Amino acid sequence: MIYQERNGNAVAVHQGENKMDIADLDFSHRMDMELSKHSFPYFFQNVLGMMYPKYMEEWLESMETTDRTVIICSRDHGKSVFMHSWVVWNLVFQEPPFQMLYISSNQKQTMVHMREIDRYFNLPQLKHLRPSRGWAIGNIALTNGNSILERSVGSQIRGLHPQEIIIDDPL
C-alpha cells in the first residue's frame, strides 16, 4: 500500500488484496492522537515514528518529577530530538494558553532548533494545528492557542511568562 497526500490528508492507495480506505487511516490517526494525550512515549514512537531507548525513559521521568532537569549526555544520543518532540507534544496537548521558550547559544542555532520543531507540524496528524496564514519560525503559534518563542543566550526575555523553558546547547 502506498500513501499519498490529497487535500492535506494522507490517503491510502490500494494495491493488491490489502485494502484500507481514508476513514480507516483517519480513525488510526485519531486513535494515535487520543492515546498520545497522556503518553509522551506513545506520541514519540507512534506519531513521530522515533525509537524510544531506555535512557530517554529516565530523562522523561526526571522531567515529570522535578521542576528543573539538566540532561548531560554525549553527542548523538538524541537530546535535541527528544526536546523537540517534548516541545511538540506539550504544544499539542497542554491546555491553552501554554507558552514555551526555546533558548540556544546563538540566534543561528536557535533557528535550527525551531525549524526542526516546525517540521513536525507537516505530519498528517499535526497539520491541522498550523494556521492557514502560516507562522514565523521564531514565533510558532498553533491554532489551539499554544505557542513557542525562540531566544538566544543573552537576548531580551524580560516580560515573557512562559510555562516552560528549554535551554538546548547554551554554550
What are these regions (language model features)?
Residues 2-171:
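Phosphate/NTP-binding elements of NTP-utilizing enzymes
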